[in-house]
Amino acid sequence: MLNVSGLFVLLCGLLVSSSAQEVLAGVSSQLLNDLTQGLLRADFLPSLQTTGLQKPLSSAFDGVSGLLDIFGPPLTNEINTVSIQVKNPQLLHVSIESTPQRKEATVQVPFTSELIVQLLTMKPFTANMQSDIKVQIRLEKNVGGRYELAFGNCRLLPEAIWIQTGVQLAPAQNLLWQT
């Protein structure tokens, strides 16, 4: 009788385990789908607009002396006309990694777009950009005793943005911006 009971418990455990994995897989895919749709509904992709580089680049040249004093005004005038426009922004498949013992998870959001760089004296060129955004979320208890999601560390992975211009096989045209 003990052997039959033990076998029954073992079979029930295996059945529950496999059923739980199927349910978790379904919930996980539904959660990721809902998360992706929520990010798209947040309407942040169309809010990416033309960016002027005048202020950041001008402040970078403020303390520089020497040759830049000679070439500074023409270069600064050219910088004032630089603009970058983000086109065709897309979210790729969002993934989530959880740590149940610490009540937190990490959401990874792959992002791609085209950058159109316009200079006054040159024809505009297009660069393809790809980056992964990693956001830490955790479950916290609020003052009223209810649990809510809190967003923690948000960073780019792998601490870089890949930008490529021209032919994809030309490695000299790849740029890597470290953050």
From Swiss-Prot:
It is found in: Secreted. Transmembrane segments: none annotated. Expressed in breast cancer and salivary gland. One of its GO terms (biological process) is surfactant homeostasis. Keywords: Secreted, Signal. Its main location: secreted. InterPro entries: BPI_fold-superfamily_member (IPR051902), Lipid-bd_serum_glycop_N (IPR017942). GO terms for molecular function: lipid binding. Residues 1-20 form the signal peptide. The keyword Phosphoprotein does not apply. GO terms for cellular component: extracellular region. Belongs to the BPI/LBP/Plunc superfamily. Plunc family. Major protein in sweat, has surfactant properties. PANTHER family: BPI FOLD-CONTAINING FAMILY A MEMBER 1 (PTHR47015), BPIFA4P PROTEIN-RELATED (PTHR47015:SF3). This is Putative BPIFA4P protein. It comes from Homo sapiens (Human). The gene is BPIFA4P.
